[in-house]
Curated annotation (Swiss-Prot):
Domain of life from the UniProt record: Eukaryota
SUBUNIT field: Component of the pre-66S ribosomal particle.
Annotated GO CC locations: nucleolus; preribosome, large subunit precursor
Family under the similarity heading: Belongs to the NSA1 family.
Annotated function: Involved in the biogenesis of the 60S ribosomal subunit.
Biological-process GO terms, alphabetical: ribosomal large subunit biogenesis; rRNA processing
Region (Disordered): 405-436
Species name: Candida glabrata (strain ATCC 2001 / BCRC 20586 / JCM 3761 / NBRC 0622 / NRRL Y-65 / CBS 138)
Gene name for this UniProt entry: NSA1
Keyword annotations from UniProtKB, A to Z: Nucleus, Ribosome biogenesis, rRNA processing
Principal localisation: nucleus
InterPro entries per UniProt: WD40_repeat_dom_sf, WDR74/Nsa1
Protein name: Ribosome biogenesis protein NSA1
Subcellular location: Nucleus, Nucleolus
Length: 436
């Protein structure tokens, strides 16, 4: 498996090549074939968002407010025979896309223990060809255009929405002429925005309402942190209203809630469940298709499924837990239980088979989705906040590993033969001495 990870401490991308069974925490276990560092720009410019446009074409959004267009290719490694390594070139960039001053007035109201910092919460394609949405925590929505011929990245428009934002999830379950995306954050209710086909206008088309007060008649705090879309309700279903918007989506919150929304049903969630006992904050949301249909998951992680009861999802808390639930909010199991020792800052799903995890304990891990067994564990020496699989390459790596193992076995066998030959010579000498 060839993997690319965004590393916070030095602002680099690290490329790792390894086979299943790799574990750098065990000396006798197989080790990575390659760990290579690329595009190192320092802590203040670490990569926050990565979007793969096509093979060898990338957009990177960095913590210093820069978005880069990067091209890559596989070349022969200069030192390891038979090994390929990626070569990255920054061919276009645009700077100055953050504005932390828009967050200053929110710091006094925030429940966070640290000061709010601006950064990118989303980087995704929109309906207009070769245009991309880059959203920031401070509520800036940038529309970027990429000219592949001239390798030029430009900013077309900037819109402002209410801050702070934890996410900006683009709807890609169906093809639409206009781009719809959802956003929200701390004390910022989920809103749906529509971007015009020409990307020159933006309008809010729907806003959620908070749930009713709890059993003590206390207001339930608002803090959506992640959202994923589902397929809309069929137009043939009972109660369908053509005059209402038709979107379904799932939300997890910073107060441990899991919400299921249907805009046909109303502005409040259809279900709003507590997942953790003491309202511990949740951070991320990744959807699974129970039928393991890879085509059911879109490029942006949304799910082409109408039924919420049959789906499964994975989320993380702000400690060390990576948790798998079903659509009813029932815990199925945990990944890396007892092994993950730091906050999981990133989880991602590859091909509906593997869960990629990285975090503050500086390890990149790969788990089997179904069995939750750990398939690989690689120490990268830095905090990790994004992971992408470039290609699996399992067969080649297994052949390399088998060749190494055969070589070790052959060496061990040769050593045993040499030892036996030496002992037989010594025994022969002893017998000759006795005869004399």
């Amino acid at each position: 498996m060839r993997v690319l990870a965004s590393c916070v401490d030095n602002g680099s991308l690290k490329e790792a090549v390894f086979g299943f069974g790799t574990d750098t925490s065990v000396q006798t276990a197989p080790q990575p074939q390659l760990i290579e560092t690329h595009l190192c720009e320092g802590l203040d410019a670490h990569v926050e968002q990565i979007h793969k446009i096509d093979d060898g074409k990338w957009l990177l959004a960095r913590h210093n407010g820069t978005v880069q267009y990067v091209e890559s290719e596989l070349v022969d490694h200069s030192e390891i025979e038979g090994m390929k390594v990626s070569h990255f070139d920054v061919v276009g960039s645009i700077t100055g896309l953050l504005d932390v001053s828009r967050l200053d007035h929110l710091n006094a109201q925030s429940k966070r223990r640290t000061k709010l910092k601006d950064g990118f919460v989303s980087l995704a394609p929109v309906s207009k060809k070769d245009c991309y949405l880059a959203c920031t925590k401070s509520g800036l929505v940038h529309i970027l255009a990429l000219n592949f011929k001239d390798k030029l990245l430009t900013k077309l428009q900037t819109f402002e929405v209410k801050a702070p934002l934890e996410f900006a999830q683009v709807y890609d379950v169906e093809k639409t002429k206009k781009t719809v995306f959802a956003c929200g954050g701390e004390e910022n209710l989920v809103k749906l925005f529509e971007l015009s086909e020409s990307c020159d206008k933006i309008s809010m088309i729907w806003e959620s309402k908070n749930v009713k007060n709890d059993r003590l008649d206390m207001r339930v705090p608002v803090w959506p942190v992640a959202l994923k879309f589902l397929q809309p309700v069929p137009t043939s279903s009972a109660g369908y209203d053509k005059n209402k918007l038709n979107f379904q989506f799932l939300v997890v919150t910073g107060w441990s809630h899991f919400g299921i929304y249907n805009t046909q049903h109303g502005k409040r969630p259809m279900k709003y469940l507590d997942l953790l006992p003491e309202r511990e904050p949740l951070r991320q949301l990744e959807l699974l298709d129970p039928s393991h249909n890879t085509k059911a998951i879109t490029q942006l992680g949304n799910l082409k499924c109408k039924e919420t009861e049959s789906l499964e999802f994975i989320t993380t808390d702000k400690k060390t837990q990576v948790l798998k639930y079903n659509g009813q909010g029932q815990l199925i199991g945990k990944y890396g239980k007892g092994d993950i020792t730091g906050l999981a800052t990133y989880i991602g799903i590859h091909d509906q088979k593997y869960l990629l995890e990285g975090g503050l304990d500086r390890y990149l891990r790969v788990f089997d989705i179904e069995s939750r067994a750990q398939k690989a564990k690689i120490y990268l020496g830095t905090n990790i906040n994004r992971i992408l699989v470039l290609d699996e390459e399992l067969e080649a790596l297994q052949e390399i590993e088998m060749a190494k193992n055969n070589k070790r076995k052959q060496t061990a066998s040769d050593e045993e033969d040499d030892a036996e030959e030496l002992w037989s010579k010594l025994e022969t000498k002893k017998e000759k001495k006795r005869k004399l």
